[in-house]
């Protein structure tokens, strides 16, 4: 079951995203970004974690036509080892409608079994849903 973007309200929790970033995915990310492979032999590049979270969010909540990714903030708190089990908790921090747009801010907290490793906020805007009679 997927989440309807237009049904989101402040305080709503989206399903948690559980994942691991295997070494092969790290190598593919490094090849795509041109980053130095030697610098990431054990840990995951921080922005790769953000990409995983955004991909999981888009899988859970397909965006409506006309949606825009309005902003992204990440605070990287600790290194993550390749293959380490991770869980991202997603909560709607803000939701408003302005000038025909639905604006949603989703707060993220990424955890390992023992610690928080990332906090972030994603802002998405889309034309407000049409009211049908």
Predicted region positions:
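Hot-dog-fold acyl-thioester-processing enzymes
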Residues: 1-71, 131-132
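HotDog/MaoC-like acyl-thioester-processing domains
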Residues: 3-5, 80-133
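Well-ordered beta-strand positions in beta-sheet-rich domains
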Residues: 18, 73, 119-123
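Short histidine-centered beta-strand/loop micro-motifs
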Residues: 39-42, 66, 78-79, 84, ...
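Short structured motifs
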Residues: 71-77, 91-92
């Amino acid at each position: 079951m997927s989440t309807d973007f237009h049904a989101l309200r402040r305080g709503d929790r989206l399903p948690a995203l559980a994942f691991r970033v295997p070494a092969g995915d790290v190598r593919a990310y490094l090849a795509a970004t041109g980053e130095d492979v030697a610098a990431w032999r054990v840990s995951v590049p921080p922005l790769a974690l953000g990409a995983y979270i955004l991909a999981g969010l888009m899988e859970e909540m397909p965006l409506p036509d006309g949606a825009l990714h309005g902003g992204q903030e990440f605070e990287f708190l600790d290194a993550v080892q390749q293959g380490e089990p991770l869980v991202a908790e997603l909560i709607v921090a803000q939701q408003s409608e302005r000038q025909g747009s639905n604006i949603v801010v989703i707060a993220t907290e990424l955890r390992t079994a023992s610690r928080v490793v990332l906090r972030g906020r994603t802002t998405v805007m889309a034309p407000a849903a049409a009211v049908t009679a």
